[in-house]
């Protein structure tokens, strides 16, 4: 994958996360700064999603663990645990928000 393709894919994913949060979860604050997207919850916990351009990965830090996602076909898959990115965000955000959060 070329760098410009990676940036287009990650930018689109970041926008998808922002749009999902803004449309349905007013108690979650979403802030993007450069290649980092931070989701902040009322209980002061955070989920941090960031680009790792040299590796063409997306890294996610949650209260539980850190995850490194690589694009496999059209799906971002964690290279250690095999989690799909949207499913991992759904689980982590639901846990940290204390209410159902879904990234379809």
From Swiss-Prot:
Signal sequence, start to end: none
Gene Ontology MF terms in the entry: ferric iron binding; ferrous iron binding
InterPro entries: CyaY (IPR047584), Frataxin/CyaY (IPR002908), Frataxin/CyaY_sf (IPR036524), Frataxin_CS (IPR020895)
Gene3D superfamilies: Frataxin/CyaY
GO CC, any one term: cytosol
GO terms under biological process: iron-sulfur cluster assembly
Keywords on record: Iron, Metal-binding
Pfam families: Frataxin_Cyay (PF01491)
Superkingdom assignment: Bacteria
Purpose of the protein: Involved in iron-sulfur (Fe-S) cluster assembly. May act as a regulator of Fe-S biogenesis.
Family per similarity comment: Belongs to the frataxin family.
HAMAP family in UniProt: CyaY (MF_00142)
Protein name: Iron-sulfur cluster assembly protein CyaY
Gene: cyaY
């Amino acid at each position: 994958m070329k760098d410009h393709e990676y940036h287009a894919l990650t930018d689109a994913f970041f926008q998808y996360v922002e749009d999902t949060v803004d449309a349905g979860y007013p108690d979650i604050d979403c802030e993007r700064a450069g290649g980092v997207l931070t989701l902040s919850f009322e209980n002061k916990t955070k989920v941090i999603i960031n680009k790792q351009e040299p590796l063409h990965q997306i890294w996610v830090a949650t209260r539980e663990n850190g995850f490194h996602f690589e694009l496999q076909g059209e799906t971002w898959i964690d290279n250690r645990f095999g989690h799909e990115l949207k499913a991992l965000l759904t689980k982590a955000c639901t846990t940290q928000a204390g209410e159902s959060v879904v990234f379809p």
